[in-house]
């Protein structure tokens, strides 16, 4: 099972816990970050800065997800929905771990290569 599939499964459990049906919705913030990534690909095509720019866009997605899951976890705790808060916390921890891994890649390889070019 992929990490994303785990996130979906946990979200389905959160919705079941609050007796609501999940609905898909386009997230304008993520669309904006994706558009930014597309601009980076055009502007820096063939450049060592391309990887650094794409990594920055990927981290922007992670930071948005961390913000959303953190907020949802806080709300769940405030509403006394400890099971939902626990599920959201698991996903939040995974998002933070991914962000830390991206930071490590950026600092140890990608940004160094872009700067040296």
Which functions belong to the PLM regions below?
Residues 1-117:
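Amphipathic alpha-helical hairpins
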């Amino acid at each position: 099972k992929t990490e994303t599939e785990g996130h979906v499964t946990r979200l389905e459990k959160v919705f079941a816990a609050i007796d609501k049906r999940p609905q898909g919705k386009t997230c304008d913030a993520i669309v904006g970050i994706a558009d930014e990534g597309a601009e980076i690909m055009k502007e820096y095509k063939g450049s060592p800065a391309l990887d650094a720019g794409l990594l920055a866009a990927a981290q922007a997605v992670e930071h948005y997800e961390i913000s959303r899951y953190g907020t949802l976890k806080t709300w769940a705790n405030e509403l006394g929905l400890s099971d939902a808060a626990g599920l959201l916390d698991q996903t939040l921890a995974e998002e933070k771990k991914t962000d830390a891994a991206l930071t490590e890649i950026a600092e140890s390889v990608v940004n160094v290569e872009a700067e040296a070019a």
